[in-house]
Every structure is written in C-alpha cells, then in structure tokens.
Regions:
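ATP-binding N-terminal substructure of ATP-dependent carboxylate-amine bond-forming enzymes
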Residues: 1-111
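A long amphipathic alpha-helix within ATP-dependent nucleotide-binding catalytic cores
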Residues: 228-279, 328-350
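C-terminal structural cap/anchor segments
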Residues: 278-358
Length: 358
C-alpha cells in the first residue's frame, strides 16, 4: 500500500492559500509538499527561508484566486514540476484557472460544496437526513410572522456565523425584513444548549469520524457576531456528552459522510451539532463542505501525541490533515484518525485588516 509520504515524493502537492496557517497541517520539511501564500510577518517566521514555501510580496493581501494568477506563483509551480493544486475553499473561478493551466485541482467541485453548504439547497440535498435538523422551513423574508418565540434566520450563504441571525423580538425581525424583503431564508427553531463540532474525512472506502470538540461561539471580545465560531476545546465533550450522545453524534456524522460519498465527495468535511439542554437530543446545525478551520491545530495536537506514542512504541497512524491528503490523492486507506481528548484554541476575529509585509 502506497503511503502518503511516498506518494508526495512522486506526485507533489502545492497548497495555495491566502492564510498560511491553513496549510500547516503537515510539517514544512515534508518532501513533495509546497505552499504558496501571502508574505506577512507571521508567514515569514513560519517559512524561515524554506525553498518549498513561496511568499508573495504585495501591498495588499491576495486571495487564493489572485495568488493563482500571480506570475511568481505560476513560475514556482512550473519550476517545481507540480501538477496537484490544493486550496482551502474551492470556487468556480479557481476551477477555471486550474483548467487553463492544466493543473489538477484536488478539491471536490465548488458546485457540490455550495449545494451542501448553502442553507436552502442543503435541505434538498439532505433528503431524509433532514430528520437530524431542528424543526425548520424555507420562506420569503417579508412573509415571516412573529409568534413570540425566538428563532434562527439564515440567508442561503453563511460562513462562521455571518448571515445567521438570532431573532429574539419582533423588532429584530422587522429590521431584517426591511433590508431584505424578497430574500429566501431558512427559519429554524432556536435550540438552547452547547455546540459541538468535528472534522471528518471521506475516503474512497469509508468515513473517518474525527474528534468531537466543544465549539466556542460568539465570545466577546474575540467577535462581535453571536454565532461566529472563535475556538475549539477538545477536552469538554467528555464532560458534557454521555456515551449514548457521543454515539448519536457519530451516527449523524457518518450519515452525512455517506451522503457526501454518494455525491462524489472526497476529503474533509465538518459538522456542527447542538445539544438541546431541555431534551438531551442532538441536532445537526451546519455542514462545512471543505477543510474546517480547526483542521491545522487539531493535526498539530495529533502530531504531538503521535510523537509521544512513537517513543512509547504505540504510534497511531494519521492526523486529520494527512487523512485529507490521502483521500484527495485517492490512495488506499487502512487507518483511523489519531484520537485526542485535550487541547483548545481561541481565534481573534475582530481585528484590523492584515497588511502584507513590504
């Protein structure tokens, strides 16, 4: 069975990303693994002059599409004979650029990712799996009536809590209706309770269920958005979820993963789940059809545990990011993910725009 390490040596990958931290799921000295990103003070410290990392110097931070169109990036890809391109979040524009240059884009199609992630098309895609969602309906914004119960209102496209609104009063509702009267929205019953998430991998053979973590959401001063995810804690689920609830969570993740597999998906996806504090039931809240933002840090935690177990002679196989690449390269897979039950991170989302170094 070909390992990821040997596959990368003969079939290298370049991760092209606006933010270099998205690409740090593998050690930077991994043979056959390249990164192209923006030149920031943080990126320079991380790259430390490595020849497999190209940092683009511009006055403003470039997005992934702009990096792919940059001549320095294109020359770097050509000089290193790289055919495989990996990005954080695929778009139709990125697909067009890769096709033009005869690069193989490893990410699943942008159209499929959008269908799965968008709040309205997701309902049709889920089919019978909508049983895992809280009570919900699709409506035109202006037609929604206030019935004295709080609810969640979502636009079709939302990311890290943007486009998601907690409607607590009739005034809250009217403010949105005045701005977006004709917009289709998803209306969902508000479920009060802690949020959980995890990172899973669809391989060609099975669904790998990742480590459940507590989702830190809407915490000031790290964000000014009440539903924005700003961190993760891998130790809390053992304290907050019973064994039966963990099984219920894994059943939801597996069902979503199998639906993704049937749709042609490969690689990472995440789910967000809420525990109803009144009924102890778990509800599916969101599907992230892409590499979730917590992947890099989780993989670092797994790598640290792996080194410890290697020294003890009990090494487990792959990190979440390694499994992601293994799946995207369509390699045979006979491993499980490294389990972790400790570690946490906080992300500052309210901050000035990042300027590229000069």
């Amino acid at each position: 069975m070909e390992t990821l390490a040997s596959a990368l040596k003969s079939n290298p990958i370049v991760y092209v990303t606006r933010d270099i931290e998205r690409a740090l799921g593998l050690p930077l000295d991994t043979s056959g693994y390249f990164i192209i990103s923006n030149s920031t003070s943080f990126a320079k410290r991380i790259a430390n002059g490595r020849t497999n990392v190209l940092l683009i110097e511009e006055t403003e931070v470039l997005d992934t599409r702009e990096i792919l169109e940059n001549k320095l990036a294109q020359n770097f890809i050509k000089e290193n004979s790289i055919k495989n391109i990996l990005v954080f979040k695929n778009t139709s524009q990125i697909e067009t650029i890769c096709k033009k240059h005869d690069w193989k884009l490893l990410n699943p199609s942008a159209a499929l990712a959008n269908k799965v992630e968008e709040k309205i098309s997701q309902i049709e895609w889920l089919g019978e799996l909508t049983k895992y969602l809280p009570p919900h309906r699709i409506a035109i914004c202006k037609e929604i009536k206030w019935d004295n119960l709080p609810f969640i209102l979502q636009f079709n496209r939302a990311h890290t809590g943007q486009g998601t609104f907690f409607i607590q009063t009739e005034t809250d509702l009217k403010l949105i209706q005045e701005k977006f009267p004709e917009r289709p929205v998803r209306v969902t019953d508000y479920i009060k309770g802690p949020m959980f998430t995890n990172n899973n991998v669809v391989t060609k053979e099975k669904i790998l269920i990742g480590n459940i973590n507590y989702q830190i959401t809407g915490l000031t001063p790290f964000t000014d958005q009440p539903f924005s995810t700003i961190g993760n804690d891998w130790s809390l689920p053992d304290k907050l979820l019973s064994p039966d609830q963990k099984k219920q969570y894994c059943d939801i993740a597996t069902a979503v993963g199998l639906r993704l597999m049937a749709s042609g998906w490969k690689g990472l996806f995440g789910i967000d789940v809420v525990l109803d504090e009144d009924t102890d039931k778990l509800y599916l809240i969101e599907i992230n059809a892409r590499q979730p933002a917590s992947t890099t840090y989780e993989s670092m935690l797994q790598e640290a545990k792996n080194k410890e177990q290697w020294n003890n002679g009990t090494m487990e196989p792959l990190t979440t990011f390694e499994a992601h690449l293994t799946a995207l390269l369509d390699l045979d897979f006979d491993f499980d993910l490294i389990t972790i039950d400790t570690g946490a991170q906080i992300i500052l989302r309210v901050q000035p725009p990042v300027q590229s170094s000069e």
